[in-house]
From Swiss-Prot:
Record-linked PROSITE patterns: RRM
Organism: Caenorhabditis elegans
Cited InterPro entries: CEBP_ZZ, CEBP_ZZ_sf, CPEB, Nucleotide-bd_a/b_plait_sf, RBD_domain_sf, RRM_dom
Gene assigned in the entry: cpb-2
A matching Pfam family: RRM_7
Function comment: Cytoplasmic polyadenylation element binding protein that binds to and regulates the translation of specific mRNAs. Not required for oogenesis.
Protein name as it appears in the record: Cytoplasmic polyadenylation element-binding protein 2
Gene Ontology annotations for the cellular component aspect, listed alphabetically: cytoplasm; nucleus
Length: 570
């Protein structure tokens, strides 16, 4: 069944994914909770407590029960005594003034409270206040709630403070507010321990959005997990987009060199380069007869550790052996000297004219960018300084590039190392047999976005990783998705292709079984042939990894002859 045109997962809620006790976000959340509590208490005024909170306190309920029991005993004794002396009863009734309470429930409660306190002996009164002081010492949120209702409440636990507390409690027993539970949760969260916070936040599986709260604080982002142990935050490779054709490589170098030593690269710059993420792999000896610029040593961008790559260890030269003051032309030499092809490229980049290599490709066209470039910095600190100078808009980060002709706004897209891995749940173990390889992943896509896309499509996603290169730690365009359910894994492998829709990204990605470097054969378990398994049969009849002998053995039968293997590295 085709899984094209999937609707991307819409997020709700704002819980911490990881439950790792992120101090920055936890401190921020506590401030927000305090502000929310103050605003709710200003609107609620007197209806800000709940009987549910006070019913949890056994101490208060026991004291009230004892007081009611003692008051009932004293009332019965007085009735017995009055029945025995009728004359004194008349005098007592005439001497006592009737206490008139209004119809309001608050006034009745206040009157009954006055009667109880008058009947309470002095010794019981002191014990009552001492018990309340012990109770308040373990519940600091009571002070916060009581003072928010009564501005004249004292700072210490004196009798006036306890009386206000009792008055508030009795008032809320009759009139409870639905906002009370939320207020008490906010106040109690500030006093919760780190272990309780971790246990509560581990149950959260959904984030509110995919953009981190602050792009400049990548290490404090609460939606992502740092896979790197070191202090680095960004990749040393930065994407720069929105470049017009009039901007030259020299202009880019002159502007961004203020942040540190760097090189400029783009995919069409090195034809013989095997990996555009690491152009230094293409530094191979070349001949002048068949020249292809395969190394950025031949460009204007200087390599790391050299101020001028064309003037290193250069002896005295005659005017006839110099080429525009750059270096000596010697065929087949590369360690700081120019061969004919390098000299032609240097002239073309510096405005000496258009030259052709092998008479087929124009050097200027070959060395011109396609509207975007990659900045390869020597130090990660340079990327952080660059991000600090950028201004943020809805589309991302931008900076004004001052070239020789005009000032141009270009887009800066740094890669956060924290975006390379994402865990849905720490408590679920990762089964290496349920890991799928995702090919053709767009480089701007983060692991959290890829995880929620597959969670919405197939479900039961445990972990997602974006493959990065070893040198710059920049995405390679592929990823891995680990499932916890076998059926979800089988469905993903069976679909083979799926269209990924997210914002401006619309691309078809490939889903294949993931081959580990030491993948064992599931048929013989490596016991007989001692070989790794380079084949995987996606047919539901097999659906397992095979070494080469086991593949031929199991698929020699005519019923399995039509099975097509998925080969490692192909």
């Amino acid at each position: 069944m085709s899984k094209s045109r999937r609707v991307f997962l819409s997020m709700q809620g704002d819980d911490d994914f990881w439950g790792n006790g992120d101090r920055f976000e936890e401190h921020k959340l506590s401030k927000m909770n305090r502000r929310k509590c103050r605003g709710m208490m200003d609107t609620a005024k007197d209806d800000v407590l709940d009987e549910h909170f006070f019913k949890q306190n056994n101490l208060v309920t026991q004291e009230l029960e004892q007081q009611n029991a003692k008051s009932n005993d004293m009332f019965r004794e007085r009735q017995d005594w009055n029945s025995s002396t009728p004359l004194e009863k008349i005098n007592l009734v005439e001497s006592e003034d009737p206490v008139t309470c209004p119809e309001n429930t608050e006034a009745k409660i206040h009157c009954s409270e006055v009667k109880v306190t008058e009947k309470m002996p002095l010794e019981l009164d002191d014990e009552f206040y001492n018990n309340f002081r012990e109770y308040f010492s373990s519940r600091p949120e009571v002070i916060f709630l009581t003072r928010s209702m009564h501005k004249d409440a004292a700072e210490n636990y004196d009798k006036q403070f306890i009386d206000l507390y009792e008055k508030t409690r009795k008032r809320l027993e009759l009139r409870s507010s639905p906002q009370i539970n939320q207020i008490l949760r906010c106040t109690s969260n500030t006093n919760a321990t780190s272990s309780e916070i971790q246990l509560r936040n581990r149950q959260a599986v959904i984030v509110s959005n995919f953009r981190e709260p602050d792009r400049r604080l990548g290490r404090y982002s609460k939606y992502y997990y740092h896979h790197n142990v070191g202090p680095e935050v960004y990749s040393r490779k930065v994407f720069v987009g929105g470049l017009p054709s009039c901007v030259k490589e020299s202009d880019i170098l002159n502007f961004f060199s203020r942040y540190g030593r760097l090189q400029v690269d783009w995919p069409s710059k090195h034809y013989e380069c095997k990996s555009d993420s690491d152009p230094s792999l293409c530094n191979e000896p070349i001949s002048s007869s068949s020249y292809q610029p395969s190394s950025h040593l031949a460009m204007v961008s200087p390599p790391f550790g050299e101020i001028n790559p064309f003037m290193r260890n250069m002896p005295a030269q005659s005017e006839s052996s110099q080429t525009g003051g750059f270096g000596r032309i010697s065929s087949g030499s590369i360690g700081g000297f120019l061969n004919p092809g390098m000299a032609q490229v240097a002239r073309g980049n510096l405005g000496f004219g258009s030259t052709k290599s092998d008479g087929s490709i124009n050097g200027d066209k070959r060395q011109h960018h396609l509207g975007y470039v990659f900045l390869l910095f020597e130090k990660e600190r340079s990327v952080r300084d660059l991000v600090l100078d950028c201004f943020e808009e809805e589309e991302g980060l931008f900076i004004t590039l001052e070239s020789s002709t005009d000032s141009i706004r270009v887009q800066i897209r740094p890669w956060l190392l924290a975006d390379a891995e994402f865990l849905m749940d720490f408590n679920v173990p990762i089964n290496t047999k349920l890991v799928a390889f995702i090919g053709g992943v767009p480089r701007p896509l983060k692991a959290v976005e890829l995880a929620h896309f597959f969670e919405q499509t197939y479900g039961h996603v445990v972990c997602v990783g974006i493959d990065i290169d070893n040198k710059f730690k920049y995405p390679r365009g592929s990823g891995r998705v680990a499932f916890s359910d076998y059926d979800a894994y089988v469905q993903a492998i069976t679909d083979r292709y799926i269209v990924l829709d997210h914002e401006d990204i619309h691309k078809r990605v490939e889903i294949k079984p993931y081959f580990f470097h030491n993948q064992s054969c599931e048929e013989c378990s490596g016991r007989y042939h001692r070989q790794h398994a380079p084949y995987f049969c996606p047919s539901l009849e097999c659906f397992q990894y095979y070494c080469e002998p086991c593949w031929h053995k199991m698929h020699s039968h005519p019923s399995r002859f039509h099975h097509m293997p998925v080969v490692k590295g192909v």
